Amino acid sequence: MTPIRHLTILGSTGSIGESTLDVVARHPDRFQAVALTADKNVEKMFEQCKRFYPSYAVMLNAQSAEQLEAKLRVAGLGTMVLSGIESLEKVASLPEIDTVMAAIVGAAGIRPTLSAAQAGKHILLANKETLVMAGRIFMDTIRQYHATLLPIDSEHNAIFQSLPQHYNGDLISSGVRRILLTASGGPFHKADLQTLSTVTPEQACAHPNWVMGRKISVDSATMMNKGLEVIEAHWLFNVEPEKIQVVVHPQSVIHSMVEYIDGSVLAQLGNPDMRTPIAHALGYPERIESGVQSMDIFKIAQLNFEAPDFERFPCLRLAYEALSKGGNMPAVLNAANEVAVEVFLAGKIPFTVIPAIIEHVMESIDRQEITDLEDVLAADLRARETARKWLDTQAWQRGQSGAPLFRAEQWNG
């Protein structure tokens, strides 16, 4: 009989968190959700508590935690409600927990994910920023505390499945020539530059293949998402940037490929549904039911591949540059992007200004070595401040009076 895995799901109300709970619900004999966490979505967390009866529910926002606690009390549920970043770290490292789904979006996910690593947990990593901002620190922590790590991003999970089973982090000794990292290209991969300048947040969030949150949908539209995944792949698989080839594949059927020195190319295919990599990681090394519809290969009929256009999507170029420079630059890239996407989603800037903000911030901050988490967070903070100050001075965001439409201090992302 397979022992029950006890889970903490960091970011349970997001799209990855909900998909994880969908898979968990299909296997009540294998998984138990002990702790669920969210930022401030009280209603969704309340519904999850009613269905899964977790021992702990953590809301990052203190006011939301109070609201949730009141609702649970009325409902007669005994879930303990906690709040704040320290509580996220606590439930990620509980002694009774063996598996942590790290699905918090953004830099807020770094500290609890590191806590899980320091506690030697089995980590299912969906939070990009942990590797993008603190890749060396995180991977060193995984090794130091003998934690285990499985990637949840569909592309990295596909690479993991396509590499040799006992891959040791060395492409040459494993007979691997390069990694082929696929990208859908997002909703605008054929759009001209003039069209891109008029893109609305609603259009950017309408991904043709995947169901995702708003922030990652915009990242997909700018191809920053793929740039961040290049950085992730570097740390996950110990692959240099020049050995990672991005391939635009609009159908999102092939999730990534590994090319070997004998000419073989191994690929992982499947319907674009995040429950597939989630189920793979939850059940590993076994295979478990995910609820994903069987792929109709005859209906697909045709698969297309294109080289990425760095002029149309400069965010991808900027990500490669940040990885090549190393040090604090990936953290700077990520923070500037988070600010830029936030103001774009608020309708404050055009779509094409997103890479301009990021490039300005990267040019304004000198490269520095990263030695600990404090260095990472300092780089993150400085990049955000630099982005906000630049935003506050730009002519395109001024009203008829000439005053800025918003001031930098309004944005605390």
From Swiss-Prot:
Show the catalytic activity: 2-C-methyl-D-erythritol 4-phosphate + NADP(+) = 1-deoxy-D-xylulose 5-phosphate + NADPH + H(+)
Instruction: State the EC number(s).
Output: 1.1.1.267
Q: Name one GO biological process term.
A: isopentenyl diphosphate biosynthetic process, methylerythritol 4-phosphate pathway involved in terpenoid biosynthetic process
Q: Does the keyword Lipoprotein apply?
A: no
Keywords, ordered alphabetically: Isoprene biosynthesis, Manganese, Metal-binding, NADP, Oxidoreductase
UniProt cross-references to SUPFAM superfamilies, sorted A to Z: 1-deoxy-D-xylulose-5-phosphate reductoisomerase, C-terminal domain (SSF69055), Glyceraldehyde-3-phosphate dehydrogenase-like, C-terminal domain (SSF55347), NAD(P)-binding Rossmann-fold domains (SSF51735)
Q: In which pathway does it act?
A: Isoprenoid biosynthesis; isopentenyl diphosphate biosynthesis via DXP pathway; isopentenyl diphosphate from 1-deoxy-D-xylulose 5-phosphate: step 1/6
Cofactor field: Mg(2+); Mn(2+)
GO MF annotation terms: 1-deoxy-D-xylulose-5-phosphate reductoisomerase activity; manganese ion binding; NADPH binding
Instruction: Please identify the protein, giving its name as recorded.
Output: 1-deoxy-D-xylulose 5-phosphate reductoisomerase
Specify the species.
Nitrosomonas eutropha (strain DSM 101675 / C91 / Nm57)
Lineage of the organism:
Bacteria, Pseudomonadati, Pseudomonadota, Betaproteobacteria, Nitrosomonadales
